[in-house]
Amino acid sequence: MAEVADVDLREPEEYPKPVAETERIRAGAQMLNEAANPLIWAGGGIISSRAQEALLRVAEHLQAPIITTPEGKGAISERHPLALGSHRLRNDPVAKEEPHFDTILAVGTRMANPVWLGGQRVVQVDIDEAELGRNYENTFGIHGDARQTLESLYENLVQLSPARESREEEFNALRQRRSETAIRVEPQDSIVATIRNVMPEDGILISGMTQIGYYSRAFFPVYEPRTFLTSSYAGNLGYAYPVALGAKVAQPDKAVVAVSGDGGFLFNSQELATAVQYGINAVVIVFNDNAYGNVLRDQVNRFEGRVYGAALHNPDFVKLAEAYGARGVRAGIDQLEGALAEALAVDAPTLIEVPVQAMPTPFE
């Protein structure tokens, strides 16, 4: 056990990105050029590939609005005329209203929830060939890196036809219909709006597996890439706070806020020690309903109120934070705005506990 040995460290490898086949690019561009009413579905692959500019060039040439997955939030600023926000599973005019989108360009998304597609043709771009057409049959797949493929698609599109006339007025009306028909629930809607109003536009929100996190996927506007982080399909409890610390280390000059439930936060609450030890001044908002909220709601509503393993006996979160040397604050929903503004102004790791009651389902 006390021996010393030399170890050869391996050099990091730059794994080559797949380059889309020329013929697939040409065929995909032709399909998009022929589409009367195209729509772009942008996923996290846009963010990973840093393909925002290439995406926007294609969208503006086609006058195709962009809807994002939660992982793709930030692929386009939600103030852009072509931005429709994130898709909703139900009651979404993008799916229900005419004229229907006839061709979908899906980039960097598994299309795991294609429930609102109604027979449209899909041109799917993905770096993982196994994902092409896996969740939706009527798919023309292009295997390649998002940025490189979008750049090639754009080069082909400009050769096929000039840029289309602006449809800004039409899409503004669609955005308005989406806003008017959205199923908004309280207190989630007010809380998410408060957090957005307090955070700077380039601030980073980590969306934990909690009622506020779920709701933020559709209703937290994002204006820059890599400013909305989520555990995606994995749905990990305990994800939010450690990721917030990593984000703050990577971007020390940006505001970093994690939203977490009480149950999820307790998976990694000991990382308060890390934050204090290394001066990582991220903010975590713990929404405390003394339960695994989703599980408890389902047990009450679907299993005749038989509650098992969903109610929690929690610590005093303010004292817990203070025991580690962090700032601890307790704030009601109506006090959250001031508490968050103060936390972002203070040069110290901060936990804000917000006591809440059981919330209605955000999955609408």
Protein language model annotation of sequence segments:
Residues 20-27, 33-34, 322-361:
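Glycine-rich ThDP/TPP pyrophosphate-binding loop and its adjacent helix/strand module
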Residues 1-34, 183:
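Conformationally flexible catalytic loops at phosphate/diphosphate-handling active centers
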